[in-house]
Amino acid sequence: MEVSQFDNVSVVKKANLYFDGKCVSHTVLFSDGTRKTLGVIFPATLTFNTGAPEIMEINAGVCRVRLAGSEAWQTYGAGQQFDVPGNSSFDIEVQETLDYVCHFG
């Protein structure tokens, strides 16, 4: 899933701001109708709810993640990814700014 750029896309100009600016992303729209968000999460512990399934690809930084229904935290860093089921949630702990791509399923 690792690519360095996305070609022939549209980018929504307005940023998605969550948790008082602790998470900032922009939506990228592809010609086939799929979408992704490119964003950063600043140091915090946050809980995200999902509608569609998501694949979170980490570009830079390190995070700890706990999926809904799990007691265990998993650590992910640059070049790694984790899957989140649809209609679910996950906790994420970030100590230094995290750069990510969210792929929607």
Curated annotation (Swiss-Prot):
Show the GO MF annotations.
guanosine phosphorylase activity; purine-nucleoside phosphorylase activity; thymidine phosphorylase activity; uridine phosphorylase activity
Concerning Gene3D superfamilies, the annotation shows:
Jelly Rolls
Record EC number: 2.4.2.1, 2.4.2.2
Domain of life, source organism: Bacteria
- Name the reaction it catalyses: a purine D-ribonucleoside + phosphate = a purine nucleobase + alpha-D-ribose 1-phosphate; adenosine + phosphate = alpha-D-ribose 1-phosphate + adenine; cytidine + phosphate = cytosine + alpha-D-ribose 1-phosphate; guanosine + phosphate = alpha-D-ribose 1-phosphate + guanine
InterPro entries recorded for this chain? Ppnp, RmlC-like_jellyroll, RmlC_Cupin_sf
Q: Does the keyword Aminoacyl-tRNA synthetase apply?
A: no
Pfam hit, one: Ppnp
A single cellular component GO annotation: cytosol
User: Sorted alphabetically, which keywords does the UniProt record give?
Assistant: Glycosyltransferase, Transferase
What is the stated purpose of this protein?
Catalyzes the phosphorolysis of diverse nucleosides, yielding D-ribose 1-phosphate and the respective free bases. Can use uridine, adenosine, guanosine, cytidine, thymidine, inosine and xanthosine as substrates. Also catalyzes the reverse reactions.
Family indicated by similarity? Belongs to the nucleoside phosphorylase PpnP family.
State the name under which the record lists this protein. Answer: Pyrimidine/purine nucleoside phosphorylase
The species is Cupriavidus pinatubonensis (strain JMP 134 / LMG 1197)
